[in-house]
Curated annotation (Swiss-Prot):
Coiled coil: none annotated. Catalyzes the hydrolysis of N(2)-succinylarginine into N(2)-succinylornithine, ammonia and CO(2). This is N-succinylarginine dihydrolase. GO terms for molecular function: N-succinylarginine dihydrolase activity. It catalyses: N(2)-succinyl-L-arginine + 2 H2O + 2 H(+) = N(2)-succinyl-L-ornithine + 2 NH4(+) + CO2. Disulfide bonds: none annotated. Pathway: Amino-acid degradation; L-arginine degradation via AST pathway; L-glutamate and succinate from L-arginine: step 2/5. Substrate binds at residues 19-28, 110, 137-138, 212, 250, 359. Keywords: Arginine metabolism, Hydrolase. The keyword RNA-binding does not apply. The keyword GTP-binding does not apply. It is an enzyme of class 3 (hydrolase).
Length: 447
């Protein structure tokens, strides 16, 4: 059956700021306390979405979350009106204010793990929300992510959206950023490659930075998504590269159809894994980048592998890259050699995503890939699909509500909270989502 990959990109939220919340993510740490530009961040993301939609790649949008997220501050013991809660936390414990104001839901590669209908036992598309257990600020996302996905994939005959795994370290799950699918045409059954950083009872794990994904979580997600057991491979990421800042697999590898583009040090027991893939995926091609040409450090600083590998109708592929790749002579030199070599990659497309990149999120972090048949695509909430009308409406919305400068101190401004809620109210109507945010269901959250 014919099917296409639809990229659902996260729209950057109104409180996008640099707080260095993500230990193990070196860009996040390096840019801590810099002044951010939420308006520019959102527009950079929108430009990528629109350019890819115009180039013929189906594209949709996932909206931001409510931030600052007052209900969690109340759970932490801050009381009073919303304004009083903000004032107290800013004075007594500003790090909590930063955490509950993170715009990290923009990186929707961590929103969920997807199984296309061609791979599942019941023939539905399955989406399992990630618990993002390793980081407090990201663990807050799961409930609203589930509401958003259910509002977008709202046809229960075709889609099953599963709640996140229990919030414990043993079941740490980071979603599609640690998941690849390999195979032929999108509508054919594919091989799902789940990548984990640690498993219980196995001493092979990083020592400097945390391994956020567990094998136990990956196995549970594969079960929830009803993936045919014959179409699953579990592989461990190389712990040495996690210790060099590769906090998700999509920082060191990207797949599309029959191609796996990865660093030669991406996986533990890599040669064994590639041999397994060759045996199980027709036409499998590994493009391994040698460390002598691109070091792990350069891969992390440029986000070479946090790219999007997209298929054209003729079977050729386009690699979508952040501007940092073009600005690095060694990486850009390698990429031009890649273009000239015998492989499906025939075009490089570069985007300026600096606002997201400074927090450690490149093109691949910003998108959730969902393979859909034509019938399934028609069943998706049509209001989220990118086109000229939506692009213009979202740009106008960003111009109306977003600040062009934000510091950590600004997060305590009650107007940021009020304006953010008004903005999301308008957006949820524009995208026909219903009441997906807690403040919409609780009358403003003054509890």
């Amino acid at each position: 059956m014919n099917a296409w990959e639809v990229n659902f990109d996260g729209l950057v939220g109104l409180t996008h700021h640099y707080a260095g919340l993500s230990f193990g993510n070196e860009a996040s740490t390096r840019h801590r306390f810099q002044v951010s530009n939420p308006r520019q961040a959102a527009k950079q993301g929108l430009l990528k979405m629109k350019a890819l939609a115009d180039a013929g790649f189906p594209q949709a949008v996932i909206p931001p979350h409510e931030r600052p997220f007052i209900p969690v501050l109340r759970q932490l013991g801050f009381s009073g009106s919303d304004e009083q809660v903000l004032e107290k936390v800013a004075r007594q414990a500003p790090h909590w204010l930063s955490s509950v104001s993170s715009a990290s839901p923009m990186w929707v590669a961590n929103a969920a793990t997807i199984a296309p209908s061609a791979d599942t036992l019941d023939g539905k598309v399955h989406l399992t929300v990630a618990n993002l257990n390793n980081k407090f600020h990201r663990s807050l996302e799961a409930h609203v992510t589930e509401s958003l996905l259910k509002a977008i994939f709202n046809d229960e005959e075709k889609f099953s959206v599963h709640s996140a795994l229990p919030q414990v370290a043993l079941l740490g799950d980071e979603g599609a950023a640690n998941h690849n699918r390999l195979g032929g045409h999108y509508g054919e059954p594919g091989m799902q490659l789940f990548v984990y950083g640690r498993e219980e009872g196995n001493d092979t794990r990083p020592s400097r930075y945390p391994a956020r994904q567990t094998r136990e979580a990956s196995e549970a997600v594969a079960r929830l998504n009803q993936v045919n057991p014959q179409q699953v491979i579990f592989a461990q990421q190389n712990p040495d590269v996690i210790d060099q800042g590769v906090f998700h697999n999509d920082v060191i590898a990207v797949s599309n159809r029959q191609v796996l583009f990865c660093h030669q040090q991406a996986f533990a027991r890599q040669s064994q894994l590639l041999a397994n893939l060759r045996a199980r995926v027709n036409g499998f091609m590994a493009i391994e980048v040698p460390a002598t040409q691109v070091s792990v450090s350069d891969a992390v600083s440029t986000y070479l592998f946090n790219s999007q590998l997209l298929s054209r109708d003729d079977g050729s592929m386009m690699l979508v890259l952040p501007q940092e790749c073009r600005e690095h002579a060694g990486v850009w030199g390698y990429l031009n050699e890649l273009l000239a070599a015998d492989n499906p990659i025939s075009e490089l497309k570069v985007f300026d995503l600096r606002e997201s990149m400074a927090n450690g999120g490149g093109p691949a972090c910003l998108r959730l890939r969902v393979v859909l048949t034509e019938e399934e695509r028609r069943a998706v909430n049509p209001a989220v699909m990118m086109n000229d009308t939506l692009f213009n409406a979202l740009n106008d919305w960003v111009d109306r509500y977003y600040r062009d400068r934000l510091t950590a101190a600004d997060l305590a401004d009650p107007q940021l909270l009020r304006g953010g809620r008004e903005a999301l109210d308008v957006l949820s109507q524009l995208l026909n989502l219903g009441s997906v945010y807690p403040f919409q269901r609780e009358g403003g959250g003054n509890g």
